[in-house]
């Protein structure tokens, strides 16, 4: 039952984050859809860590380096997702209010992604690795 509550909480968090992103794009005072490019970062952010989890063996000394590289790449993707709306706002492609909404959405979405890996990342019967 705890897994179902976690799954519902994570889906609610994802919906709230996407709502902030859409508000930053679709409100009539902003009406620019450039911030939707951060969706690519949402898709790309878990990929390095997922690949590293599949490839490494915890007993191998190289596994630590592979995991650290995956965390480094994930960090670069997350920082880029936060930097892109700021660059758009500085270049006057979007308004600063839209930038604030997108950054709020980024925070919620990445917290949801982190929560997914914390809840479903263990090696038990209720793990995402079996999907």
Swiss-Prot record:
A Pfam cross-reference name? Vps55
Tell me where on the tree of life, at the top rank, the source sits: Eukaryota
Q: Which GO terms describe its cellular component?
A: endosome; membrane
Q: Where in the cell is it found?
A: Membrane
Q: What Gene Ontology terms for biological process does this UniProt record contain? A: late endosome to vacuole transport via multivesicular body sorting pathway; negative regulation of growth hormone receptor signaling pathway
Q: Where is the chain membrane-spanning?
A: 7-27, 32-52, 69-89, 100-120
Q: Which GO terms describe its molecular function?
A: identical protein binding
Write out the tissue specificity statement of the associated record.
Answer: Widely expressed, with highest expression in heart, testis, adrenal gland, thymus, and spleen, and lowest expression in lung and skeletal muscle.
The UniProt keywords, alphabetically, are: Membrane, Transmembrane, Transmembrane helix
Function comment: Negatively regulates growth hormone (GH) receptor cell surface expression in liver. May play a role in liver resistance to GH during periods of reduced nutrient availability.
How it assembles, according to the record, is: Interacts with RAB13.
The UniProt family comment states: Belongs to the OB-RGRP/VPS55 family.
Q: What is this protein called?
A: Leptin receptor overlapping transcript-like 1
